[in-house]
């Protein structure tokens, strides 16, 4: 028998473990430590390296796969990506479905679902788990066991039971385990009215009052928050959701978009909530960002044609087609954004001990649809830093941020636009600097000024003061007659401003003037102890007025 080939050993390497030990023990002593300056440099380099290792907000979706790509894990992954979160997935079922409905369902074995959960949760830092289609009692219990073994920061439960097309996606027997086991672990549960009805034994939900009662009843099952979604209440003029935290009911209103491309809205909303929670948002803020995102996505997708069925998907990545990504596109301004226009005031915020960032955050949480930073007393650097911070908040919320007068600040922080007065740079000059993808507003008091704003390429005009105001010196009051004259003459959307508060905002909108899209408010929001409460109250007044 031939001898075994001798193993080749490089002459500079040890040929055995004992030799290796000898080399280690006989190696020269460590070099002396670096001098203090070098040590300081090394610490700085290490700190810089650590700073570059940014944590990525991570959402794990536990849901079914939609072969048509409109709902399920496909919608979840797209929604999380659109809001800047990483999304991993555990597939609970594989469905054959398209725009016409669901043709077949294959449920993944429970043990393999458990294996998927273990793979992700044991290795990756998951911030939030979001659930979708959980087809059986066993699947729900596997999830509960895994979450007890691997706790996460938050659990968002979308109790998917029936598809948009009406097909059953979960056994009726899962209702009890949802109520008795899963909901108690949830930070928020997001049923639509049909799902809420099933969870409560088939009760009828036809009004907002019914939705409130349902939210309160579901809350008793143990979740920290409940969001009952009213998008399926087609007889309603708007899409109203009811949010309940165990103490307070909050109605969240959105415009109803006329489109058939609504497949996956529930999955998307829950995934957006999960993404914002993973980024550290409060629950109410996360819900508002999610609702704004879905409304905007539906608006941008309303005319898309995908498939031949009645329930089409919508474009989660619509922002890639909007400024600043597409420089040649037209402005993305929508007149309805003027509905509740919050204008900040540094003096008022200082009076109440708020930063500009805190004021903007509070206004958005209360329901402001657009925000203008008007900071007359701030130094440029201070103003810019505040504007950048506010821009992050507004961008994540889908609420436009405009800068008053300061085009340089708007450019530096990439704000959504600028508002200028009659003594400032013209709208035409501002457009030359900002480009076609930004919003430009102009203060106007006369039909001639409104016409000039139109000629200069403005997007809207602010008209006032409608009432006497202390925020602007030597500002003449136009009254209802002056407002009416400008609105009738204007070819642009109009927002009323000047002395508007909770006692008179309704009367302004009740005028029913053409092109009047909303009110701009300063003191009534920011010269108060609670910006959130005042903004919410103002939003309610305006919403109720617009319904009449």
Swiss-Prot record:
- Where is the transit peptide, renumbered to this chain? 1-47
Record field: catalytic activity = 2-[(2R,5Z)-2-carboxy-4-methylthiazol-5(2H)-ylidene]ethyl phosphate + 4-amino-2-methyl-5-(diphosphooxymethyl)pyrimidine + 2 H(+) = thiamine phosphate + CO2 + diphosphate; 2-(2-carboxy-4-methylthiazol-5-yl)ethyl phosphate + 4-amino-2-methyl-5-(diphosphooxymethyl)pyrimidine + 2 H(+) = thiamine phosphate + CO2 + diphosphate; 4-methyl-5-(2-phosphooxyethyl)-thiazole + 4-amino-2-methyl-5-(diphosphooxymethyl)pyrimidine + H(+) = thiamine phosphate + diphosphate; 4-amino-5-hydroxymethyl-2-methylpyrimidine + ATP = 4-amino-2-methyl-5-(phosphooxymethyl)pyrimidine + ADP + H(+)
The primary site where this protein sits is: plastid
- One of its Pfam families is Phos_pyr_kin
Secretion signal, residue range per the UniProt entry: none
Cofactor, free-text remark:
Binds 1 Mg(2+) ion per subunit.
Name the residues that bind 4-amino-2-methyl-5-(diphosphooxymethyl)pyrimidine. Answer: 372-376, 404, 443, 472
Q: Where is the composition biased (Polar residues)?
A: 1-10
Q: Which GO terms describe its biological process?
A: thiamine biosynthetic process; thiamine diphosphate biosynthetic process
Pathway annotation from the record:
Cofactor biosynthesis; thiamine diphosphate biosynthesis; thiamine phosphate from 4-amino-2-methyl-5-diphosphomethylpyrimidine and 4-methyl-5-(2-phosphoethyl)-thiazole: step 1/1; Cofactor biosynthesis; thiamine diphosphate biosynthesis; 4-amino-2-methyl-5-diphosphomethylpyrimidine from 5-amino-1-(5-phospho-D-ribosyl)imidazole: step 2/3
The EC designation for this entry is 2.5.1.3, 2.7.1.49
> Which Gene Ontology terms cover its molecular function?
ATP binding; hydroxymethylpyrimidine kinase activity; metal ion binding; phosphomethylpyrimidine kinase activity; thiamine-phosphate diphosphorylase activity
Which named protein is this?
A: Probable thiamine biosynthetic bifunctional enzyme, chloroplastic
């Amino acid at each position: 028998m031939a001898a075994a080939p001798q193993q080749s050993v490089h002459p500079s390497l040890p040929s055995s473990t004992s030799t290796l030990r000898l080399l280690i023990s006989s190696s020269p002593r460590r070099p002396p430590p670096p001098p203090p300056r070098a040590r300081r440099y090394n610490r700085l380099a290490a700190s810089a390296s650590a700073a570059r290792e940014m944590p990525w907000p991570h959402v794990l979706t536990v849901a079914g796969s939609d072969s048509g790509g409109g709902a399920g894990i496909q919608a979840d992954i797209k929604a999380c990506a659109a809001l800047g979160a990483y999304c991993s997935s555990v597939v609970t079922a594989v469905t054959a479905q398209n725009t016409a409905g669901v043709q077949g369902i294959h449920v993944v074995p429970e043990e393999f679902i458990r294996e998927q959960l273990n793979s992700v949760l044991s290795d990756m830092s998951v911030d939030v788990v979001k659930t979708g289609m959980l087809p059986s009692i066993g699947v729900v219990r596997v999830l509960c066991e895994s979450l007890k073994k691997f706790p996460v920061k938050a659990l968002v439960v979308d109790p998917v039971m029936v598809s948009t097309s009406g097909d059953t996606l979960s056994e009726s027997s899962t209702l009890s385990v949802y109520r008795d086991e899963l909901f108690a672990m949830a930070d928020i549960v997001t049923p639509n009215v049909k799902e809420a009805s099933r969870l409560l034994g088939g009760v009828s939900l036809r009004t907002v009052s019914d939705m409130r009662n349902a939210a309160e009843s579901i809350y008793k099952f143990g979740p920290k928050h409940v969001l009952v979604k009213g998008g399926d209440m087609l007889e309603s003029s708007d899409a109203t959701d009811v949010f309940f935290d165990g103490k307070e009911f909050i109605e969240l209103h959105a415009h109803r978009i006329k489109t058939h491309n609504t497949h996956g809205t529930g999955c998307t909303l829950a995934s957006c909530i999960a993404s914002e929670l993973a980024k550290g948002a409060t629950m109410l803020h996360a819900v508002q960002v999610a609702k704004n995102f879905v409304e905007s996505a539906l608006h941008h997708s309303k005319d898309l044609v995908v498939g031949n069925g009645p329930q089409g998907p919508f474009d989660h990545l619509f922002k890639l087609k909007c400024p600043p990504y597409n420089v040649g596109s037209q402005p993305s301004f929508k007149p309805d954004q003027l509905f509740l226009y919050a204008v900040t005031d540094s003096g008022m915020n200082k009076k109440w001990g708020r930063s500009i960032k805190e004021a903007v955050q509070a206004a958005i949480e209360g329901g402001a649809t657009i925000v203008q930073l008007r900071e007359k007393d701030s130094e440029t650097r201070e103003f810019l830093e505040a504007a950048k911070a506010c821009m992050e908040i507004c961008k994540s919320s889908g609420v436009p941020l405009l800068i008053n007068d300061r085009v340089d600040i708007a450019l530096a922080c990439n704000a959504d636009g600028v508002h200028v007065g009659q003594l400032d740079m013209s709208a035409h000059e501002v457009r030359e600097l900002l480009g076609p993808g930004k919003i430009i507003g102009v203060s106007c008091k006369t039909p001639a000024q409104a016409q000039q704003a139109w000629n200069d390429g403005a997007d809207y005009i602010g008209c006032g003061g409608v009432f006497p105001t202390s925020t602007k010196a030597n500002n003449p009051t136009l009254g209802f007659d002056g407002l009416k004259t400008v609105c009738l003459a204007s070819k642009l959307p109009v927002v009323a401003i000047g002395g508007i508060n909770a006692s008179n905002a309704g009367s302004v909108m009740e005028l029913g003037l053409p092109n009047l899209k909303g009110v701009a408010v300063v003191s009534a929001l920011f010269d108060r102890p609670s910006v959130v409460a005042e903004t919410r109250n103002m939003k309610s007044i305006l919403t109720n007025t617009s319904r009449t």
